[in-house]
Amino acid sequence: MQNLVILGATGSIGKSTLDVIKRNPERYRAFALVAATSVERMRDLCIEHRPRYAHMVDESAAKRLADALPTGLGIEVSSGDEALLGLVTAAEVDTVMAAIVGAAGLLPTLAAVRAGKRVLLANKEALVMSGELFMEETKKSGAQLLPVDSEHNAIFQCLPEQVQREIGHCDLSAAGISHILLTGSGGPFLTSPLDTLATMTPAQACKHPNWSMGPKISVDSATMMNKGLEFIEARWLFNTARDELKVVIHPQSVIHSMVQYRDGSVLAQMGNPDMRTPIAHAMAYPQRISAGVEPLDFFKVGHLSFCEPDYSRFPCLKLAMDACHQGQEATTVLNAANEVAVAAFLDGRIGFTDIAVINGECLGKIAKTHLDSLDAILALDWEARRLANQLISRV
């Protein structure tokens, strides 16, 4: 029986993880559920899954949750950073699902890595903000890192076993690999006229054609910043050289990514667009378990199409790829600026196309600095957020 801590339990990844646990009760137990402020959803999850611990990032939310839970469940409710870090590093914990969206997930995820846990990584920002430090800590502690993002999980499945065992420090060329092909649907605005993008609303941006996701990642998919962040994440997970990683638009989201080998072979991982598949794979690796996902019906798929990304339509993707090549400072700044800009767009304070403008200006204005510690990373993150908010106030 594996004990899991689920960071981001009330989000889409968290709920899908709990569904997989429920389908495999003889193998997994939700040891602790972690959320930010969603008291009602957390209460319902606690009643259904009976974790030993429920942690709310917000202290007042923790108090409301404690009052809302029926007596007799025996669930300990906590809040605060110290309690959270204690949960992810607890001796009873085998696996940590890192699914808190954004920079907020970095500290507990890094703590789980340092404690040598099996970490299922759905929080791409951890690598975008601190890729070099994160991978060094993974190697030092011996933690097992398994990607949950559908694309990175697909790539992982298409790699030789030896490369899988050396994630973060692998040599793709030595394994006969020429390219990793990172696929993306292009989001809801793939074919929208360019002159209409400035007036797109949050509701329109959140209507992804294939995936069911939260608001932040839905907007990132509409700008293709999500693919840009995944590009950066893939660089760290698979130790890619500059010319070993490419982005391919694939509107149907049936092929989740591909690996191209030197002999001309291309291995692709395919399946219906349901996050329970990569979650179940990461949870059970190297075995396989039921995920509750319908098998792919090739007769219904009909056809698959591919095209190159249009950077005039998706400037955020180009910003992210360029930042990846510039280094850790640029990706840390970009991630922070984008989180602030997307929040402002969802609040109706800026337009859709302003997101890329804010991101680009932040990248151009913050002075370069050497990020040699977590404190330095967090300081740069704070400075980028301050600048982004300043720029937004002038829009």
From Swiss-Prot:
It comes from the Bacteria. Signal peptide: none annotated. Its EC number is 1.1.1.267. It catalyses: 2-C-methyl-D-erythritol 4-phosphate + NADP(+) = 1-deoxy-D-xylulose 5-phosphate + NADPH + H(+). 1-deoxy-D-xylulose 5-phosphate binds at K124, S150, E151, S185, H208, S221, N226, K227, E230. GO terms for biological process: isopentenyl diphosphate biosynthetic process, methylerythritol 4-phosphate pathway involved in terpenoid biosynthetic process. The keyword Membrane does not apply. GO terms for molecular function: 1-deoxy-D-xylulose-5-phosphate reductoisomerase activity; manganese ion binding; NADPH binding. Pfam families: DXP_redisom_C, DXP_reductoisom, DXPR_C. NADPH binds at T10, G11, S12, I13, A36, N123, E125, G214. InterPro entries: DXP_reductoisomerase, DXP_reductoisomerase_C, DXP_reductoisomerase_N, DXPR_C, DXPR_C_sf, NAD(P)-bd_dom_sf. Pathway: Isoprenoid biosynthesis; isopentenyl diphosphate biosynthesis via DXP pathway; isopentenyl diphosphate from 1-deoxy-D-xylulose 5-phosphate: step 1/6. Keywords: Isoprene biosynthesis, Manganese, Metal-binding, NADP, Oxidoreductase. Its cofactor is Mg(2+); Mn(2+). The keyword NADP applies. Mn(2+) binds at D149, E151, E230. Coiled coil: none annotated. NCBIfam families: Dxr (TIGR00243), PRK05447.1-1 (NF003938), PRK12464.1 (NF009114). Belongs to the DXR family. Catalyzes the NADPH-dependent rearrangement and reduction of 1-deoxy-D-xylulose-5-phosphate (DXP) to 2-C-methyl-D-erythritol 4-phosphate (MEP). This is 1-deoxy-D-xylulose 5-phosphate reductoisomerase. The lineage of its organism: Bacteria, Pseudomonadati, Pseudomonadota, Gammaproteobacteria, Alteromonadales. The gene is dxr.
